[in-house]
């Protein structure tokens, strides 16, 4: 019997730390799991090479975010392509609300049968309550 096929996605340092912990636990519980992903140094530290370079997403501030919008859209497309090509059973999207929403939308369009899980959702109560509807 083969283990689950899991694709992890983290686009910022805090998410990358969480992904590392999830990968370590998943390997402990299911040693035959196939795990691929997109992330940074923490993901690499557990032996998973990032499918795409996410360094352009390391942005701070409103104006820097506006300048990087084209990169966000391009990387969301590249991430979705990598996910669909890997054909996982489940994708775990960690943190980075805006980027992960774009990735999730693209994956749903290209491969609607792939299950998507959001780990560390946005603080709906602290930001925009309308996000709760989008998450559901």
Protein language model features and the residues they cover:
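Active-site and donor-binding regions of nucleotide-sugar-utilizing enzymes
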Residues: 4-136
């Amino acid at each position: 019997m083969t283990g689950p096929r899991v694709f992890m996605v983290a686009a910022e340092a805090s998410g990358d730390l969480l992904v590392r912990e999830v990968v370590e636990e998943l390997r402990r519980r299911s040693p035959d799991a196939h795990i691929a992903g997109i992330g940074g140094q923490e993901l690499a530290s557990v032996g998973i090479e990032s499918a795409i370079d996410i360094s352009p997403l390391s942005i701070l501030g409103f104006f820097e975010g506006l300048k990087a919008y084209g990169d966000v859209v391009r990387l969301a497309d590249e991430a979705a392509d990598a996910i669909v090509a890997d054909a996982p059973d489940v994708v775990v999207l960690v943190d980075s609300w805006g980027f992960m929403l774009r990735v999730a939308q693209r994956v749903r369009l290209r491969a609607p049968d792939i299950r998507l899980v959001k780990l560390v959702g946005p603080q709906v109560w602290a930001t925009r309550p309308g996000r709760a509807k989008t998450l559901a």
